[in-house]
Amino acid sequence: MCELLAMSANVPTDIVFSFTGLAERGGVTGPHVDGWGITFYEGKGNRTFKDASASSKSHIADLIKSYPIKSEIVVSHIRQANRGCVSLVNTHPFTRELWGRYWTYAHNGQLSEYHDKFTVSRFQPVGDTDSELAFCWILESVVNHFGEQEPENMQPVFDYIATLADEIRELGVFNMLLSNGIDLMAYCTNNLCHITRRAPFGKATLIDTDVVIDFSQETTPNDVVTVIATRPLTNNENWVVLSPGDWKLFRKGELVLG
């Protein structure tokens, strides 16, 4: 399967430390060698970097590990292919426009017997993965349910998306990250965890490579940063492990739903 990584923060923050740990799982400490991608939000815009090769050997990944792109929301994914060939078009995260915002999505897991359920017309997949088709179906269902205008209150939208994720989970393993550039949603079938860092900040040590960071030297007392991952990335912090069917919604680093 694949691995997920995401971040929600109340100030523009770089994800160099966490991505350095994740990238090692793309061929060094893990078997996820079939591509990787990462999306950084900046206001209503975003920038996405992808590569169909292993993150541990990718020069583009080296850039992400060395150049601190600051963002309040980041979504990332390293791939171990099961549905769809190894190619750039099948590499997560996937992005679509809805209600004048870019929605970004990544999925870890594998689905079966899904083609009859995922009927879409407006949102079409470009590649041939179960993941991208599920994303298109979620957005199509949201538009059919809520209409063409973005609701003033987004809580019912994410509540509804959680019910859709429950349906998808009946078809297999569905761990999901989803963001509209404001909120970050995480849905768990079997492997997902998160940690929220706030003052007083301390040191953290990566599991997958010999890197230590002192967050007190990198942050201010007002910073709040939540990181979501398939498995804990550090060995000296208390990560919160989600249970099957759990979902969380974060805004500016804080838990707002779930």
PLM regions with names:
Residues 1-59, 204, 245-247, 253-258:
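Extreme N-terminus nucleophile/cap motif
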Residues 2, 103-113:
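Conserved beta-strand-loop-short alpha-helix elements that form
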Residues 52-64, 78-100, 117-121:
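Short acidic (Asp/Glu) patches
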Residues 73, 149-190:
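Catalytic core of PPM/PP2C metal-dependent serine/threonine phosphatase domains
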Residues 111, 179, 245:
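Glycine-rich phosphate/ribose-binding loops and adjacent secondary-structure elements
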Residues 113, 120-145:
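Glycine-rich phosphate-binding loop plus the immediately following alpha-helix
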Residues 125-130, 190-213:
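Gly/Ser/Thr-rich active-site loops/lids in small-molecule metabolic enzymes
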Residues 203-246:
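A conserved acidic, glycine/proline-rich C-terminal tail/linker
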